[in-house]
């Protein structure tokens, strides 16, 4: 990795193994999670702690666990759970959504193509998209490969079980396989 920014992001956000200040409390609060879900919770905690976003859009969550980790990592974040086709009307602060930093979590299930397309067309360039299940099957893998090449996408990180997409297109387009 030649980019200092990408190196720091991989080292201190994606692969950080040092226990964060809230991990122990969160493990007691949110118990009974399988290993992969706990790993994702911690990743979302670190990502939100790093970005300090104004909004976190949680599309079709399989569990409420992400909410606890996200809100513990950033006190100012406005968490929104979306269980149906997304519309800006679902968010009280919709006028800020297109101009503020936002993290959108979308599992590649249900009608994910429309949700991803909507997010890419409407969120600010400071936003980040996290897609779960990018290597789940042939279709999701193909979708991920197309997304990497999409003109609305900047730097991407392939973590195998999920993909992190930065919408800042003024950065040199690069896909890091971590």
PLM regions and their residue ranges:
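A short alpha-helical cap/connector motif
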Residues: 1-125, 135-178
């Amino acid at each position: 990795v030649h980019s200092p920014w990408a190196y720091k992001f991989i080292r201190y956000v994606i692969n950080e193994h040092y226990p964060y200040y809230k991990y122990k409390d969160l493990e007691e609060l949110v118990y009974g999670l399988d290993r992969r879900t706990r790993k994702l919770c911690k990743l979302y905690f670190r990502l939100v702690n790093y970005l300090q976003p104004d909004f976190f859009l949680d599309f079709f969550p399989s569990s409420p666990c992400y909410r606890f980790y996200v809100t513990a990592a950033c006190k100012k974040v406005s968490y929104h759970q979306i269980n149906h086709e997304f519309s800006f009307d679902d968010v009280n602060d919709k006028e800020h959504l297109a101009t503020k930093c936002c993290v959108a979590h979308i599992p590649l299930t249900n009608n994910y193509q429309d949700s991803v397309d909507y997010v890419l067309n409407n969120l600010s360039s400071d936003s980040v998209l996290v897609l779960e299940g990018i290597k789940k099957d042939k279709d999701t893998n193909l979708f991920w490969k197309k997304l990497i090449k999409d003109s609305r996408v900047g730097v991407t990180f392939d973590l195998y079980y999920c993909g992190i997409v930065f919408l800042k297109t003024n950065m040199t387009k690069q896909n890091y396989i971590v």
